[in-house]
């Protein structure tokens, strides 16, 4: 396969709301460039980009897919990203590896939440942005309504490049505002036709484009205003648009139909002439805050931005080359781990199909076999100590407990999940040793459902799914004194231990043990046995068997037998006193309270606060979000038992814009009205046997 240098490469991430036509546009781009012989459809399950069995089944993209096309001696690497919010890892991967983000929105639906989220993520990372209005062939498509919505939502940077001329809801031709020419299409082949009569609207759009271009250059600005809106040449417009897009001043808008190929050629021209090549950007951010400019040195620097785990083929690493040359079989250093690695094959991806490559240059994206690298790792040549900054992914906020349906698969579950977490950085896995549950975390119900289905399809493991057990605690609310006597006679040698202990609440999470024994009623050599008996007893409370915290025990008195007393007997006596004492000390249940940070739009604040109050939460405060421009951060404390489905609720209220993170903060007393239900559903445990 032909190799390309930085200047002749464009890396674009296709993003947008779920169902916005991204994958269909990608099919159109590949077909128009001659990379595929026939166009597939998401609905038919035969598109180039959606090839995973779960994607075909669900008819949505679950992860980032990579393909390429070649147009006028420029290679365009296309990263098709998921539009569903549960699969945001794919969006982050795609944007991190691209210089430009092309955001699709359907002509019928206009700006949606996914449109806004994709734009915000692109701008946050300093990427060039472009909008493509899709599905222009559909009935009731309305490009100009979409254009007004884009201007309202994203401001004056919006600049149409290709617009339709429609009549009675049907597109009759596509207008290239750079050329001021109109085209009709037959299977993607353009034919120039006479410009439509609506000249005033088109002249207004052209003048707005010229003004936007004028603002990118002082000389052009002077000419524009001195000559009362003087128009520019096509070359000046292209250069001005290119510069403005790179600086973030201009966001171009084109329109097309992925299915009929109308306007696809003009979209391709916009990509190669106006979007930046890798070497025109500020470069890749390094861990130390500096940037490595694409194509600025000969030594290899590359980053792994995506990993695919396959039980048969092994690991496939998607790599973006920043500098130098990556060659198959040539040793590299993994700067993240410090290990020497030898790449296997270099592959140029066309969905699931591959072409072998001997080498690839700065700015290009390839897949590599036999790398023991993870997503976010940096690969360099010997002597180059560059380490690239790692992408920050959304934190899991939806959790389920899983267990193998076939007990023989129990040992395989952890290994399978480990492979999946390598592949998807928004999945998490934890083995909770207290509740003895394997906890799988993700971004939502659909996310975990797809992960569990993948576990079955890829690794052959079927699992049971349940809600995680809440790790409650028990404590006491008043001081009591209790006695425990363990006396047992069997044959010659008996057992005897007798203690009197005071139990009281305290602030310490672990047991506080003291002794105030006078006169030797309990010999000192048995004090450790009493303490150990109490320590072991606190593993289970008297209400529901949960661990006991905030407990102080003071050994006051007791008695012993010179022959029958032993450490074991005093341990048992302490346990008896513990059970009797705690039952009389007004025992209570404590529930875990989480510190929750909700990021939301201002319009949803009232509804979210109502939800928090209904879930026994307390709002601590609100501030403008530092990371999400135009959003608000709301801090609250909410019981862990009340946040099980909070991710779904927040997403519904905020229309997908909002999200939350939670971390354990402290324990609080469970309201008495809820105790009976918790006790009834508490997991069973084995009684202390000494």
At which residue positions do the language-model features occur?
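Structural and coupling elements of P-loop NTPases
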Residues: 1-690
